[in-house]
Structures are given as structure tokens and as C-alpha cells.
């Protein structure tokens, strides 16, 4: 009995060592800085004083860490659209944070407190309407719609909106390049759609607050959507996007039609090339000699980065700039080698 008990004790004592040896690479954070370095890449790709809309945990918390702990780009306001459904988070966004000025969500607290304007209906009217006028209509308590047996709802008077554009101002600010200036009109116009491209019949509080921000911003502060947020968060604005790295910037013109299915809107090749080649860091992914373990989340993240770099290279080729297109691909292969990050189908356009 004593021998058996001793053997069982020895076997049980070995279990933690076995678990450690088999799972050490999964859990060790030694030399693994991909999370925070990718957060830096997001932030350092943005224009000064930018607003960045994110949606999930993995595209928000690393950015908050980079700002709160490492002090990276505290002029940028990371705005999580999931949390923007709550009144307390809208309160936060309306206050200054570090070097970031309050976001231009211009409505009194009682207009967005929980239970008020949680859902805003949209009239089936496709006549273009100034977005700020539509916002003011919805904020007027006299425009509450009552339904028999139900509580009242506020509503937007249509689904197609415009935002005015001061051409001289957006060119002078650097938002629009000289070659893009010919695309400018006196306003942008778009229809509010959902993730499937269908016209929406309502918006929830988070998207209503985002629209309020866009209406009041008037192109003064750079607004971006992280590429990972997904089409359900884009408010139908995809035709007015410009890719500048790992985020789409809202621009005051309709982008030329792009035949690349992986791209929404246009690519700002000059800005994105500078971001990729001069600002991005790689969290030791490029260290082939020592190697680095990449878990599932990191591999997913790398797939997205590879895709955006491939898109940039293709756009440079279309601009008849093969030298820089090849430089981007060379950097892609160097920074994310197959020894550390196995290839996936996203590498097919690169082949």
C-alpha cells in the first residue's frame, strides 16, 4: 500500500511539470510584443487628434494599454462602438482624456440616458437631408412618435444624408491631397445601410451617437474606422473611406470605384506607404533566429496585416510604381516570415 501510494504521489507531482513543459510556449510572454506593437501600428498610422472607432475586445484593449501604460498617442480617442450603446460611455467620450479633446457628441445628457433614444426609427424617405438638420429633428422632444399600446419612438426623417464640404478648408488641412481635390463637391451624400448593404429601418444608440459626432465634426477632426470593425459599423459610408494603414479614414469625397474586393473606398498610397515602411513595428515576429510562438489570435491578426500590405502593393502597381510595390512585399515577407507565421490563403495574391 505504501509503495502504491508513493507511486501515485510521484505521478501526481509530475502533472504540473508536464503541463508547464507542454504549455509553456502558449503562456510565456517572453519576447512576445505583437499585441502592443500592433496597437502602436494602429495608433501611429492615424493623423493627429484622430477619433478611431473600434468594436471588439481585441481591437480595443491593446490600444488602451498602449495609451494608458506606455503613453502612446494619447491625442487619439479610441471610441468603442459596442460601449457607445451606454450612456455612461457617451459621458466619457464627451469629456477630455489626456491630450484628446472631448468628442463632438452635441446633445444633453437627458437626450441619451438609458431608455431614451436606445433605438431611433428611420422613415422610408430617400430625399437627401442635411445630417445635422436630421440630428436636430430627432433631438426635438416634440417629434416623439407615439404608437398604440407602445412607448413612443424618436425617428430620423429619412435614410439619405448629406454633410457639407468646404473644399478650400479640407485641402488646406491636408485631409485631401492635390490629386484628390478634383473629386471634391460641395457635399457628400450617402444612404444609411446595414452590414448586408440593405437600407436600415432603425439605428441603435451607438450608431446614432456616431452620426451625431459626424454631423457636428464638419471635417475638423480626423475620423477613422478600424478595418476590423466590420460593415455593420460603417453606417453605409464605405464609398467615402480611404485606407491609410489598419484603419479607414472618412474623407469628403466619393472614392473612385475599386475592383479589389478586399478594399472599401480608396487607398491613400502615400500615407500608407510611409506608415508601413517607416512607422510599423513587428513585435519580434521578424526574429527567425530565435523564433516566436504565435497563438491563434496573433495569427488572425497577422492575416489582416498581410492582407492590407498586399492591398497597398497592388494599389502602388496600379499607380505604375513597381519599385515601391516590391518594397512593400519585401517588407511583408521579412517582417512576418513563414518560420514564425505560417502562410495562409491570404498570401495567394502575393505569390
Where are these regions (language model features)?
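ER/secretory pathway lumenal C-terminal domains and tails of membrane proteins involved
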Residues: 1-51, 61-349
Amino acid at each position: 500500500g505504501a509503495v502504491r501510494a508513493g507511486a501515485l504521489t510521484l505521478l501526481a507531482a509530475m502533472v504540473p511539470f508536464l503541463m508547464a513543459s507542454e504549455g509553456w510556449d502558449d503562456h510565456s510572454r517572453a519576447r512576445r510584443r505583437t499585441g502592443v506593437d500592433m496597437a502602436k501600428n494602429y495608433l501611429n498610422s492615424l493623423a493627429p487628434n484622430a477619433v478611431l472607432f473600434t468594436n471588439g475586445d481585441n481591437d480595443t484593449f491593446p490600444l488602451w494599454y498602449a495609451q494608458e501604460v506606455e503613453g502612446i498617442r494619447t491625442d487619439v480617442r479610441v471610441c468603442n462602438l459596442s460601449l457607445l450603446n451606454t450612456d455612461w460611455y457617451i459621458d466619457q467620450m464627451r469629456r477630455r482624456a489626456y491630450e484628446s479633446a472631448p468628442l463632438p457628441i452635441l446633445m444633453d445628457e437627458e437626450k441619451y440616458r438609458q431608455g431614451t433614444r436606445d433605438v431611433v426609427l428611420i422613415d422610408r424617405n430617400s430625399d437627401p437631408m442635411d445630417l445635422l438638420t436630421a440630428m436636430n429633428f430627432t433631438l426635438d422632444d416634440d417629434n416623439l412618435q407615439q404608437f398604440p399600446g407602445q412607448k413612443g419612438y424618436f425617428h430620423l426623417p429619412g435614410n439619405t444624408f448629406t454633410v457639407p464640404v468646404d473644399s478650400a478648408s479640407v485641402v488646406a488641412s491636408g485631409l485631401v491631397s492635390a490629386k484628390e481635390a478634383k473629386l471634391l463637391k460641395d457635399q457628400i451624400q450617402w444612404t444609411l445601410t446595414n452590414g448586408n448593404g440593405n437600407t436600415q429601418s432603425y439605428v441603435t444608440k451607438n450608431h446614432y451617437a456616431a452620426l451625431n459626432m459626424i454631423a457636428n465634426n464638419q471635417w475638423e477632426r480626423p475620423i477613422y474606422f478600424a478595418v476590423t470593425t466590420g460593415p455593420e459599423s460603417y453606417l453605409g459610408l464605405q464609398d467615402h473611406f480611404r485606407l491609410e494603414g489598419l484603419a479607414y479614414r472618412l474623407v469628403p469625397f466619393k472614392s473612385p470605384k475599386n475592383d479589389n474586393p478586399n478594399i472599401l473606398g480608396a487607398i491613400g498610397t502615400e500615407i500608407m506607404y510611409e506608415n508601413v515602411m517607416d512607422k510599423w513595428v513587428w513585435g519580434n515576429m521578424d526574429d527567425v533566429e530565435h523564433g516566436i510562438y504565435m497563438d491563434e489570435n496573433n495569427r488572425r491578426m497577422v492575416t489582416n496585416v498581410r492582407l492590407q500590405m498586399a492591398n497597398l502593393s497592388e494599389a502602388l502597381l496600379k499607380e505604375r510604381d513597381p519599385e515601391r510595390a516590391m518594397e512593400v512585399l519585401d517588407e511583408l515577407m521579412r517582417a512576418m516570415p513563414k518560420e514564425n507565421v505560417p502562410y495562409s490563403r491570404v498570401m495567394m495574391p502575393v505569390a
